């Protein structure tokens, strides 16, 4: 029989399942970020025994491996003093005439729509080590960002 008429198994046509990629570099976290990771591990561990669908079990185990790795490698950042822009600080700045407020956090805690941006994001990298009153380059423009305020966030 021609191979054109051979029925392949359904398994051959499934998308491969890969591990969730772990961001490169250190796993810096705020106290809030560490609590979020711990809560996610606890949630997945509690859910796993209750799952009956094999595909869902496989996906949950994959997620659990990711979050356990993130928990094991988490490095709680030292408290910032708010004098300069550092990991964990909130920064109010003006760019293109518009004021914005962002907080520099770990990869797993980042929610850009809520103003929580990863410390490795280009904007975070541009802001790092700046002081109030500084003008910094960003997006190929000199003096694109003016630092208006820096606040150390609570790490307790």
Predicted segments, located by residue:
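Short, compositionally biased
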Residues: 148-156
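Non-DNA-binding regulatory cores of transcription-related proteins
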Residues: 78-148
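Amphipathic alpha-helical coiled-coil segments
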Residues: 65-81
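Helix-rich terminal scaffold detector
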Residues: 1-70
């Amino acid at each position: 029989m021609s191979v054109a008429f051979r029925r392949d198994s359904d398994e051959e046509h499934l998308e491969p399942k890969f591990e969730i990629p772990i961001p490169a570099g250190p796993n810096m976290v705020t106290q809030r970020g560490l609590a979020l990771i711990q809560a996610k591990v606890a949630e997945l561990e509690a859910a796993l025994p209750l799952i009956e669908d094999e595909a869902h079990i496989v996906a949950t185990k994959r997620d659990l491996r990711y979050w356990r790795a993130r928990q094991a490698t988490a490095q709680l950042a030292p408290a910032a003093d708010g004098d300069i822009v550092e990991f964990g600080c909130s920064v109010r700045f003006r760019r293109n005439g518009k004021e914005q407020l962002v907080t520099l956090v770990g990869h797993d805690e980042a929610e850009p729509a809520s103003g929580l941006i990863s410390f490795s994001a280009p904007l975070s990298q541009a802001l790092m080590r700046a002081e109030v009153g500084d003008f910094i380059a960003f997006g190929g423009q000199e003096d694109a960002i003016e630092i208006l305020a820096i606040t150390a966030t609570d790490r307790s």
